[in-house]
Each structure stands twice: as structure tokens, then as C-alpha cells.
């Protein structure tokens, strides 16, 4: 988590656990209610620092529930409006689900059943000090150009973003480049590649290369680096 601790949740109907990385110690976390557990299941770290997790009762049983862990109060609570807050419930078990933190800061949910794709909207907010920071980038970019370079810190984010277990990982610890038109507000994404590192250690200076779409209109744009749904400071660029 962004506070430097690890939130552990598993398949036993017991308390969750918190691992303090700096101290090397474990403490008990909250116990999920109603016999819920995560005998395989997805979780995602929200930009606000909370953890969204999918639970279900017992081993591979259906009737799932979605809960948030709040590290500030060491508590688990159902997502609003309640247990059936996702169209996948009640027919899903937790192991059906997958979560991914998307660039908007929302959490996208899919399963391998027939449920529609769902998007969870976390409470707005970003934990202080975790956002990417752009240090340098070209301020003039050609339409369709390739191998442009952006330098910054925290460009990979400070977390994997999404988690599951041994069967699946929805990692988003890599930089995206987002361009927002200052005249229309339309949003475009560049193709990023060849990052200098995939480290999520705070403060590391790194770079990523990016290719502009051939279809992006000319004009002034606010350029941001995005990781795990968290955008950086804006950098004004001219696209021609």
C-alpha cells in the first residue's frame, strides 16, 4: 500500500493481516464479515490509498461481495450501496473476478462468466507524494513521431496496482503518456515503450519513450505521465 505496508487477505475465514515492511512485523487486520474470504480473488489499490477487494463465502462458493480496506482506520467495509454493488454478484465466486486500475483512477472489473464489464468509482483523492513527476520532455512533438523521450520520477507508480494471486496479475506499474487538448478537451494516449527501469522504488529518475498517434490533431496539449490511475504534473506541448 502507499503507506509502506502490505495488506494480506486469503482463503481462511480469519482476520486479514498487515505486514509492516520497515519493521518486519505482522499485525492482525480486520476479519471479513459473514464468513467471507478470498480463496483466490482480485484486489486493486485505489489512488486514495484504500484497497478494493472481492470476497465470497468459503472455498469457491458464489454470492460474492466487494469491500474496501481503509488503512487509516484498519477497517473493512462494503462498497456502497452494499453487498450486491456489482452486477457480477451474487452469481460469482471471488476467483471469477479480475480487476485493473485504469488511467482515470477507476477500477475496471471483469469476470470469466457472463457478467458485463463494471467500473468502480473510488472516493476522489490521491495519496500525497505518490504521483509521477515529469522532469523533462520535448515541448514540440510531430504528429506520428516515434521515440520521443520523457524523463521523470515515480513514472512506474509505487505499486503493481492490481493483484490476484498465482493465476493472474493485472499489473499497471508502467508509464502511460496522456495528452489532453487545450482547445477541445479531447484525450489521446501515446504508445509508451523501452522504459529505462520497471522499479517502483520512490524517487528513481527514469525515462520512457513514446510514439504519438498518427491521428492526433495539431495544437497545444497538456501532457501527463500516468501510472496506476494517477496523473503527473502537466507539461504543455505543441503538436504539429
Language model: regions and residue ranges:
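Blade-level signature of beta-propeller repeat domains, shared across WD40, Kelch, NHL, RCC1
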Residues: 93-130, 153
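Beta-propeller and closely related beta-sheet repeat lectin domains
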Residues: 39-43, 96-99
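Conserved beta-propeller blade signature
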Residues: 6-8, 51-53, 106-109
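Proline-enriched interdomain boundary motifs that mark the N-terminal boundary
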Residues: 26-28, 126-137
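Beta-propeller blade signature
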Residues: 15-23, 64-73, 117-122
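Residue-level detector of Asp-centered blade-edge/turn motifs that repeat once per structural unit
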Residues: 1-4, 45-48, 101-104
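Immunoglobulin-like IPT/TIG beta-sandwich domains and homologous Ig-like subdomains
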Residues: 3, 26-28, 36, 52-56, ...
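Edge beta-strands of extracellular beta-sandwich domains
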Residues: 231-240
Amino acid at each position: 500500500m502507499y503507506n509502506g505496508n502490505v495488506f494480506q487477505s486469503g482463503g481462511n475465514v480469519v482476520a486479514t493481516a498487515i505486514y509492516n515492511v520497515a519493521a518486519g512485523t505482522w499485525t492482525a487486520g480486520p476479519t471479513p464479515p459473514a464468513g467471507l474470504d478470498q480463496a483466490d480473488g482480485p484486489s486493486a489499490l485505489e489512488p486514495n490509498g484504500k484497497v478494493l477487494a472481492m470476497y465470497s463465502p468459503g472455498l469457491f462458493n458464489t454470492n460474492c461481495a466487494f469491500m474496501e480496506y481503509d488503512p487509516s482506520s484498519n477497517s473493512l467495509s462494503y462498497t456502497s450501496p452494499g453487498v450486491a454493488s456489482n452486477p457480477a454478484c451474487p452469481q460469482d465466486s471471488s476467483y471469477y473476478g479480475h480487476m485493473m486500475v485504469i488511467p482515470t483512477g477507476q477500477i475496471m472489473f471483469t469476470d470469466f462468466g457472463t457478467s458485463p464489464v463494471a467500473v468502480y468509482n473510488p472516493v476522489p483523492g490521491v495519496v500525497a507524494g505518490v504521483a509521477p513527476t515529469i522532469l523533462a520532455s520535448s515541448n514540440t512533438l510531430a504528429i506520428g513521431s516515434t521515440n520521443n523521450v520523457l524523463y521523470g520520477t515515480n513514472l512506474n507508480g509505487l505499486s503493481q496496482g492490481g493483484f490476484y494471486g498465482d493465476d493472474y496479475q493485472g499489473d499497471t506499474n508502467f508509464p502511460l503518456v496522456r495528452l489532453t487538448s487545450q482547445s477541445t478537451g479531447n484525450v489521446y494516449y501515446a504508445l509508451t515503450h523501452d522504459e529505462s527501469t520497471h522499479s517502483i522504488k520512490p524517487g528513481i529518475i527514469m525515462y520512457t519513450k513514446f510514439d504519438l498517434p498518427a491521428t492526433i490533431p495539431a495544437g497545444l496539449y497538456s501532457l501527463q505521465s500516468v501510472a496506476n490511475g494517477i496523473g503527473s504534473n502537466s507539461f504543455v506541448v505543441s503538436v504539429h
